[in-house]
């Protein structure tokens, strides 16, 4: 078990402390195990809480073992009081005096309101393992050091469930989930024993195991995350005997915030209330018999989930969309009264990729392929097709499925006008049969990429049997990748990019206009003028020096 020292009132600087191991713990203002900052009557080291040994929970009495082996020793100037009632002083301890404490006793440090209550926090562990297996001696020693009590019998007094990794899901574990008891691994108790004293219980998030159910691995989460994880969902159930852990199913759904209805009740209300249109109405199907409700028409619009996946969603704390099977819908046939059930996930949506869309109906027109000249033949009516069969011509049907597509002829003939198509005919027993043949690619117009417009009616169904890409690969022996090259593309190192300011790089247009010649003429003239000015300036210097020298010489000679 664990001892908790909890403040009775909201005291500044006081926190709840959990004692996980035997030892001596100091209480004071600063640098102590239990810090109390209320008034000046609290000494630096005011008192000591001595835990001689950790006692376990007694299953017979349903209380902690007696005695508790917890003492308080006063080390202060103003004293320590225990079981102090409002209006009374209680029992005061003088310096170095101690007293034995029990579950529920209160201790007041100093003359203020720093009152704490000593309470017992039981740790009763339900060991869920193999019947022949036992707890390892190392783990047993750790659990004894913190006062944990281990049992193999599940009861409401159990606080935790100890399991091994990848343990199978059992009804006892589901009972623990319903009772909101955390499922942990043995390492969690080792972490608790290492702390001695702490302000909170160690988190078990990293020490939650993985369980297995019918080969499926389930990552269990904390109990608080399981609560209300299925809120908003309504599950349609059959008899409880059909499901795995059926006796726990209703309670589990209620604990997760989900609702449930019986199949008969849902079918009775579906016609009036329109039930089944909500996406969160899910039919629960037994995993061992997935076709249990396949014959009930009113359940067709519902999504489905197996009981195994539902238990996995509850223990993991969330329901994934991939675990839900989408509903089936009914497609009514136009030629009969039968109805086809199509699963929503198998529906293929066709998107039109051209400007003209041909209605794909079962008509009397049929396209056939002649292997000799590789041309497509269009039979216009059923009568002509019958005549072809009677005459035993060499026209071969491409498949048996296409034979069934020939139906009664329409009143008007189909007229196809296309630039790249020509009409021809041949006689079978004296009757003309119109045939539309495609012109080979060599006989088409200039532009290969030109769009061909076909004037057609909805009664014509054209099926292209030969693909152009396949024919090209047979003729050339491989794909011609040059046909994908862009035409008219200019390289990045073109002359226009290197010399962007010249519009006509190969014609001396600037010289023809005379702009460059005038500029060079003016530049030459300017340089000549500068040269003349430079010469005049240089010639003027010696003359000035000579004139200055002669005048001085004259003055000197004149004085003599």
UniProtKB/Swiss-Prot annotation:
Q: Which residues form the BRCT domain?
A: 115-190
Q: Provide the GO MF annotations for this entry.
A: damaged DNA binding
Which keywords, in A-to-Z order, does the entry hold?
Cell cycle, Chromosome, DNA damage, DNA repair, Nucleus
Q: What does this protein do?
A: Component of the MRN complex, which plays a central role in double-strand break (DSB) repair, DNA recombination, maintenance of telomere integrity and meiosis. The MRN complex is involved in the repair of DNA double-strand breaks (DSBs) via homologous recombination (HR), an error-free mechanism which primarily occurs during S and G2 phases. The complex (1) mediates the end resection of damaged DNA, which generates proper single-stranded DNA, a key initial steps in HR, and is (2) required for the recruitment of other repair factors and efficient activation of ATM and ATR upon DNA damage.
Q: Where in the cell is it found?
A: Nucleus; Chromosome
Q: Which GO terms describe its biological process?
A: cellular response to ionizing radiation; DNA damage response; double-strand break repair via homologous recombination; mitotic G2 DNA damage checkpoint signaling; mitotic recombination; reciprocal meiotic recombination
Protein's name according to its UniProt entry: Nibrin homolog
Assembly and partners are described as: Component of the MRN complex composed of two heterodimers RAD50 and MRE11 associated with a single NBS1.
Every copy of the FHA domain together lies at 25-87
| Keyword GTP-binding annotated | no
GO CC annotation terms, alphabetical:
chromosome; Mre11 complex
The organism's taxonomic lineage, starting at the top: Eukaryota, Viridiplantae, Streptophyta, Embryophyta, Tracheophyta
Q: Which Pfam families does the annotation name? A: FHA (PF00498)
Task: State the organism of origin.
Answer: Oryza sativa subsp. japonica
The similarity annotation says:
Belongs to the Nibrin family.
| SUPFAM superfamilies associated with the record | BRCT domain, SMAD/FHA domain
Leader sequence range is none
> What's said on domains?
The FHA and BRCT domains are likely to have a crucial role for both binding to histone H2AFX and for relocalization of MRE11/RAD50 complex to the vicinity of DNA damage.
Nuclease found in the keyword field: no
Q: In which tissues is it expressed?
A: Mostly expressed in the shoot apex and young flower, but also in young leaves, root tips and stamen, tissues where frequent cell division or meiosis may occur.
